[in-house]
Regions:
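Mature, structured domains of secreted/extracytosolic soluble proteins
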Residues: 2-13, 18-176
C-alpha cells in the first residue's frame, strides 16, 4: 500500500513538472489560441471586471461565438476610473443593461485586427455602431472614443481562437 502511494505521488509530481515546464516554455496544447475571447478575459486577473461585465450584460455567447472580433479590453483600473467618472457603482452600471451592452459592444470591432494592422486616423466602426479612432500620439497608440476621451493601448495581440484582444487603460464610451 505504501509503495503504491509512493508510485502514485511520483506520477503526480512528474506530470505536474512536465505541465509546469510546458507552460513556462509556452508549449503544450497552445492553450492561448484554443481559448475564445471570453475565456481569455476570464482567465486574466487584470480583466476580471470586464469578464463580470460580459456576464452581466448577457454577452457571453457573443464573445464565445465563431465570429471573429477585435476586443479593446479595459483593465480593472479602467473600470474603477470610469465608475468614478460616471458617478456610478459597479452594481449600478451592471444593472443598467442597455448602457452596459452599448459600452461593451463599443469595445468590439468586427473581424480580427492585429496591432500592426490597426488603421491610424481612420474612423473604425464598432459592433455597437458608433466609431472610434486610433492615433499615434508621441509614439503611443491611443484610441479616441465617442466622447473625445483618449485611452492608451497597453498590451497587444492576445490571440484567441475567434479574434484578438488589445488591453486598454480606459473604458471607451460611445457618443451620447
Amino acid at each position: 500500500m505504501l509503495r503504491r502511494n509512493i508510485l502514485l505521488m511520483s506520477g503526480i509530481a512528474a506530470t505536474t513538472s512536465v505541465s509546469t515546464l510546458l507552460a513556462a516554455c509556452g508549449g503544450g496544447n497552445n492553450s492561448i489560441t484554443n481559448r475564445d475571447i471570453f475565456e481569455l478575459v476570464r482567465n486574466d486577473a487584470n480583466l476580471s471586471v470586464l469578464g463580470d461585465a460580459i456576464i452581466s450584460a448577457g454577452l457571453v455567447q457573443t464573445f464565445q461565438s465563431n465570429t471573429s472580433y477585435t476586443l479593446f479590453a479595459p483593465n480593472n483600473a479602467a473600470f474603477v476610473a470610469v465608475l468614478a467618472e460616471l458617478g456610478m457603482t459597479k452594481d449600478e452600471l451592471f444593472a443598467d443593461k442597455p448602457l452596459l451592452n452599448a459600452v461593451l459592444t463599443y469595445h468590439l470591432l468586427p473581424g480580427k485586427v492585429n496591432f500592426a494592422d490597426l488603421l491610424l486616423n481612420t474612423p473604425l466602426k464598432t459592433v455597437q455602431g458608433a466609431t472610434l479612432k486610433i492615433d499615434n500620439i508621441a509614439g503611443t497608440l491611443t484610441i479616441t472614443d465617442g466622447r473625445a476621451r483618449t485611452s492608451r493601448i497597453i498590451q497587444t495581440n492576445l490571440d484567441a481562437r475567434n479574434g484578438v484582444v488589445h488591453v486598454v487603460d480606459k473604458v471607451l464610451l460611445p457618443p451620447v
